[in-house]
């Protein structure tokens, strides 16, 4: 008895194009990536020239928000770097130049973490620093659940975590704040937070995500020292004074 052949193409249903929920603020595609890049670097008074001053403000649109497009190849790192260099050349003053240079440095961090993951793939499983692989974490599951759900009682932490779950995105400063809170206040293993971020981030990149978590935890390359703790109250007052 002969095995049945492959079905005809006409018999295969064409899947419907997925529709992103309105809460995800990143329309897909190369055209949208280029539109955002141009609006960030190309206007008469481009946002990138204020990047050094505005990038940590949670209440301003001071970042490029290009990370999902870099993550999925709608925009290449080379294209972003060329735009950053052009913005540096076009800077009318020292402050504007510093803004574009700061953005370029952030792009370099992204490439650096990719290199780290390539040469040291075990960072996805353990701390980069061998002497920090036996930390006695408390790993309270109830505290972790409250952190995931945005129910810690700290407004800036809770707002950031709810934004992540609802929209798939979180401001970089907020990522550092919530990561520090999880690791250094709740004493929960950074890998728990790393996995949760990868489950929800629309720009989730294994290299950048791991590098960011290990930096905050103090276990990675050129990481924040163990005694540097982001105070969520002070961070809120400084970077989101009106609670936007």
Name these PLM-found stretches.
Residues 1-127, 131, 239-244:
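Glycine/tryptophan-enriched, flexible segments
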Residues 132-138, 196-244:
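C-terminal, helix-dominated tail/subdomain
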